[in-house]
Amino acid sequence: MKIIALVFITMLALLPKGFAQAPAPGSSFFTASDGVKIHYLTAGNSGSWVVLIHGYMDSAQRMWFTTGIAPALAKTHRVVALDNRNHGQSDKPQPNGTGRALDVIELMDHLKIQRAHIHGYSMGGGITGQLLAIAPERFITAGFGGSGLTEADADLRAKAAAMDDKLPGPEGADAQAMERFRARVTAARPAGATAPETTPAAATPATPPLDLSRLSVPIIAINGSFDRPYSKTHRLWREASVFQNVILPGKTHLTAIAVGGPMPQQYIDAMVKFIDSYDK
């Protein structure tokens, strides 16, 4: 049975609950099958595992721990967040390159994690999509932050875009910050590369097609209203058997997750509640 919940969240908390009391995460490394050394952080002592995958040009510490997301999850779950290859403290065989989906599977194998919740932001969401295609049986739930899956059909893409066009766009400082971010990402990417969330793991061979209608994995998407949310989620809404679409009013690709600072409590609350609702 399809369950769809569209959530518009309006309250803003300045600090996540328990943010200041969070202990330092554990820091470790493992070596991927191609010899690349991958850094990862862990938190929490009990409960099901949650795997967190950060975005392009970021790190596990900044995106998940500094924001308060990982500490909130670690109250009732075990959390692991990797620095994608080419990022953070992991090896950088391709400077300014993207992450690799197989690194996530190999990290789970290294830690003997049979199944886990998974959540990725931006590029991390692209990697999450690949993981659902490669090994859906390994995941309890899947989360797309600042991301989703675009429609392959041109007519369906246009329909989703028309829905986004009805939403207001960012203005002033928010719009200027997004322009600076796009310019920084464009300058960092190799020539000819597309957006990181659409090319999350070029080193992953033979990724099978993803047919969400054949999966039973509950899926959540969390996007700002200024971040073209319907273009990212229309396919998820059509195909996923269980899908929750969370749209944060007045948030951009940058402010929806507040990288490097306290996280908007709305994102944390939606993510934690969803994971707990389908934990098994």
Describe the residue ranges of each PLM region.
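Conserved HGGG/HGGXW glycine-rich cap/lid loop of the alpha/beta-hydrolase fold
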Residues: 36-89
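Conserved loop-alpha-helix segment in the C-terminal half of the alpha/beta-hydrolase fold
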Residues: 71, 225-251
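Short beta-strand/loop motif that positions the catalytic acidic residue
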Residues: 215, 221-223
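Gly/Ala-rich beta-loop-alpha elbow adjacent to hydrolase catalytic centers
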Residues: 120-124, 128
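Catalytic active-site module of serine/aspartate enzymes centered on a nucleophile-bearing elbow/loop
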Residues: 249-280
